[in-house]
Amino acid sequence: NKTRAAMSVENYRFDIEAHDEVAHQAAVESMVLLKNDDAILPVAGDAKVTVIGEFARTPRYQGGGSSHITPTKMTSFLDALTERGVDAKFAPGFTLDLEPADPALEAEAVEAAKGADVVLMFLGLPEAAESEGFDRETLDMPAKQIALLEAVAAENKNVVVVLSNGSVVTVAPWAKNAKGILESWLLGQSGGPALADVLFGKVSPSGKLAQTIPFDINDDPSTINWPGEEGHVDYGEGVFVGYRYYDTYNKAVDYPFG
């Protein structure tokens, strides 16, 4: 069958570099700058930089379960810094699981933050916290990551948080510990270079929120419907799904849709 032959992997060719450039552009355009006090971003080219967070080395670049694909390329943020000749300290700070905090990793991260002009903290939701086949029970960030952020901010006030998450997390409970907050979502295979471009000022972040970020999970009307019964959930808010509820009832939010 000629059609099947034409569609086979063996006979299919594409430009890997051009493919990666499209992924890079999509990543750059999707990031949302939530906070930038004291113009901490972009990072100056001669700044002493410390990078904290396992996501910087092991990026969560896509969703889990049946959405998983094998990328043609994969460059972490740390790799992107190396390619650009940026000399930065790195400390993982935590493990990408739901296990309790590792005091040794926390202490290493706090020590690495000392004396830095800017600390880039890569925080977010590991795949164990959000993926296919189960529901999240909270909008909060993992407690061990928040504790680490507080410890680092107590040592160095020039903290920028880079979020890696597939869905909304509450920001208000910990925002005071960061001068800058960049929502980067799950950035795909070219997320590392895209983050380097945005954080160091080659590209200005211009993404807009496709979701509302509430102050608290209980501010969302859908909360009372969860978890439903026998696998079924009644959307009791009716037409007032998402931002429509907040707009209609003038409910204050942390960051609005759009």
Predicted feature locations:
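Short, surface-exposed polybasic-aromatic patches that bind anionic ligands, especially phosphate groups
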Residues: 3
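C-terminal non-catalytic regions of proteins with extracellular/luminal or membrane-system context
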Residues: 7-17, 21-258
